[in-house]
Amino acid sequence: MVKLAFPRELRLLTPAHFTFVFQQPQRAGTPQITILGRLNSLGHPRIGLTVAKKNVRRAHERNRIKRLTRESFRLRQHELPAMDFVVVAKKGVADLDNRALSEALEKLWRRHCRLARGS
């Protein structure tokens, strides 16, 4: 049985981890969300989240977006390539309901899987 935990080693924790991804990212995006990815040498994917107050004003909306994004990553972690991902929320993401946000994230994870196989 596959473990679907979300331990500390699956998270980008330091500014250096985020900078590594921002230097040479592979991009996959929608008008509301962009996922940047860069191959790592760890053998497993990691995720970092950026949901700016400028783009999503209310704290409960920012928390909802982060919670759904982490859950989407947690459920797909074994299908994803060994990459570091940074999920960037843009203006309008708060207007998506939970289902639309989950579907958008699934589409972007699939696109990153295709990009990783192609490179």
Curated annotation (Swiss-Prot):
It catalyses: Endonucleolytic cleavage of RNA, removing 5'-extranucleotides from tRNA precursor. The keyword Transport does not apply. PROSITE patterns: RIBONUCLEASE_P (PS00648). Pfam families: Ribonuclease_P. Its EC number is 3.1.26.5. GO terms for biological process: tRNA 3'-end processing; tRNA 5'-leader removal. It is an enzyme of class 3 (hydrolase). Keywords: Endonuclease, Hydrolase, Nuclease, RNA-binding, tRNA processing. GO terms for molecular function: 3'-tRNA processing endoribonuclease activity; ribonuclease P activity; tRNA binding. SUPFAM superfamilies: Ribosomal protein S5 domain 2-like. GO terms for cellular component: ribonuclease P complex. RNaseP catalyzes the removal of the 5'-leader sequence from pre-tRNA to produce the mature 5'-terminus. It can also cleave other RNA substrates such as 4.5S RNA. The protein component plays an auxiliary but essential role in vivo by binding to the 5'-leader sequence and broadening the substrate specificity of the ribozyme. Consists of a catalytic RNA component (M1 or rnpB) and a protein subunit. NCBIfam families: rnpA. HAMAP family: RNase_P. Belongs to the RnpA family. This is Ribonuclease P protein component. It comes from Salmonella typhimurium (strain LT2 / SGSC1412 / ATCC 700720).
